[in-house]
From Swiss-Prot:
<dbReference type="InterPro" id="IPR036046">
    <property type="entry name" value="Acylphosphatase-like_dom_sf"/>
</dbReference>
<dbReference type="InterPro" id="IPR020456">
    <property type="entry name" value="Acylphosphatase"/>
</dbReference>
<dbReference type="InterPro" id="IPR001792">
    <property type="entry name" value="Acylphosphatase-like_dom"/>
</dbReference>
<feature type="active site">
    <location>
        <position position="22"/>
    </location>
</feature>
<keyword id="KW-0378">Hydrolase</keyword>
<dbReference type="GO" id="GO:0003998">
    <property type="term" value="F:acylphosphatase activity"/>
</dbReference>
<feature type="active site">
    <location>
        <position position="40"/>
    </location>
</feature>
<feature type="domain" description="Acylphosphatase-like">
    <location>
        <begin position="7"/>
        <end position="94"/>
    </location>
</feature>
<dbReference type="Pfam" id="PF00708">
    <property type="entry name" value="Acylphosphatase"/>
</dbReference>
<keyword id="KW-0614">Plasmid</keyword>
<comment type="similarity">
    <text>Belongs to the acylphosphatase family.</text>
</comment>
<dbReference type="InterPro" id="IPR017968">
    <property type="entry name" value="Acylphosphatase_CS"/>
</dbReference>
<protein>
    <recommendedName>
        <fullName>Acylphosphatase</fullName>
        <ecNumber>3.6.1.7</ecNumber>
    </recommendedName>
</protein>
Length: 94
């Protein structure tokens, strides 16, 4: 991973299921040119792996706090991840 590229594993909690959060995440990630995936978790949260240029990852982390209409974000927790784990393009995994 070059120094201007990074990856983050993100857990978003609140009202984030049943509000098209995964579709919204994919659309936002594609606009920013990010690679990765997003999925619903059984505890009602959403997990995403985002990878790309540092500035785009930072913008996506900010965007997660807004979410799509109908979402109510309680927390956005992120940790450093390896961009090697991110597939090319962006997909919804479940």
């Amino acid at each position: 991973m070059t120094k201007d590229r990074r990856a983050a594993l993100v857990r978003i909690t609140g009202r984030v299921q049943g509000v098209c959060f995964r579709d919204w995440t994919r659309e936002e990630a594609e606009k920013l040119g990010l690679d990765g995936w997003v999925r619903n978790e059984s505890d009602g949260s959403v997990t995403a792996l985002i990878a790309g240029p540092d500035g785009a990852v930072s913008r996506m982390l900010e965007n997660f706090w807004k979410g799509p209409p109908g979402a109510s974000i309680a927390d956005v927790a992120s940790e450093v991840a390896s961009s090697v784990e991110a597939p090319a393009g962006f997909r919804i995994t479940r």
